[in-house]
């Protein structure tokens, strides 16, 4: 079933406070949809559908998809385009506060898609990771710099807290770049598409994931300082000198496996 409305968004201006940059390049839209490979049986949710450019392609394969949109002015416009699909649902709310768990079950995990507002992308990814057991995969358009951070390994200048904590939960794939001219208005930065696939069986398991998160956050708090200096700020009675690790190393030199082992040594 084809979407007949050619330009339902005429007159709607992108809002800076919502971080809106509308994707308009059909070639890129097609490439994103091919990467996702939507199916009718998918439990698909799109965050920030904007003009509905990607939605229009996805919904033809998955008519029961849902979207989460904060901008209330976009709701009637999206309904005008997609109300012909009886199972299409819109949640007019802030994705940062939304309980994505209510949309999924272990038998029907979510597939999450989104052109995420760059000003909230990192906290939103951390929010979504908390629902990792209920998510099959995630495909996001993000600032290229954020994608590089997500995919970075030890020793890379982009490697940090976001890298470690995302890779603890997910396999990360940097798929392809998207130049500014593909958007209206044009962002001042390059963008990229990333695929995050939560592990069904994690390669490294922390006994206390909350402690691992605290450890990683503390270790990267001041990147130029050594582990010895940063880990003093854990505010717990810990014998750091007894650890089987060189405390003169910096946070960006430790692998995910080393962080998990360190966490399990400190908090068995």
From Swiss-Prot:
Enzymatic class: transferase
Name this polypeptide is given: Ribosomal RNA small subunit methyltransferase A
Single GO molecular function: RNA binding
Q: Which Pfam families does the entry mention?
A: RrnaAD
Gene, per the UniProt record: rsmA
Report keywords, A-Z. Answer: Cytoplasm, Methyltransferase, RNA-binding, rRNA processing, S-adenosyl-L-methionine, Transferase
The scientific name of the source species is Saccharophagus degradans (strain 2-40 / ATCC 43961 / DSM 17024)
User: Record's family?
Assistant: Belongs to the class I-like SAM-binding methyltransferase superfamily. rRNA adenine N(6)-methyltransferase family. RsmA subfamily.
Q: Where in the cell is it found?
A: Cytoplasm
């Amino acid at each position: 079933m084809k979407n007949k409305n050619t330009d339902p968004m005429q007159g709607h201006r992108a809002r800076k406070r919502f971080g809106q940059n509308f994707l308009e390049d059909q070639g890129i839209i097609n490439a994103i949809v091919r990467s996702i490979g939507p199916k009718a049986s998918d439990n698909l949710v799109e965050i920030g559908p904007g003009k509905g450019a990607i939605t229009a392609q996805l919904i033809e394969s998955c008519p029961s998809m849902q979207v989460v949109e904060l901008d209330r002015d976009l709701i009637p416009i999206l309904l005008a385009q997609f109300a012909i699909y009886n199972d299409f649902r819109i949640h007019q709310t802030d994705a940062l506060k939304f309980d994505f768990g209510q949309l999924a079950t272990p038998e029907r995990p979510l597939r999450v898609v989104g052109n995420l507002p760059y000003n909230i992308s990192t906290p939103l990814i951390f929010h979504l990771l908390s629902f990792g057991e209920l998510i099959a995969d995630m495909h996001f358009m993000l600032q290229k710099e954020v994608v590089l951070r997500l995919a970075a390994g030890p020793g890379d200048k982009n490697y940090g807290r976001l890298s470690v904590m995302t890779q603890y939960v997910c396999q990360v794939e940097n798929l392809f770049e998207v130049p500014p001219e593909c958007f209206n208005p044009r962002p001042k930065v390059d963008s990229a598409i990333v695929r995050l696939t939560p592990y069904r069986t994690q390669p490294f398991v922390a006994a206390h994931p909350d402690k691992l998160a605290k450890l990683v956050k503390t270790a990267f708090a001041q990147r130029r300082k050594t582990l010895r200096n940063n880990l003093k700020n854990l505010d717990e009675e810990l014998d750091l000198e007894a650890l089987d690790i060189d405390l003169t190393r910096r946070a960006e030199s430790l692998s995910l496996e080393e962080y998990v082992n360190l966490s399990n040594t400190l908090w068995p």
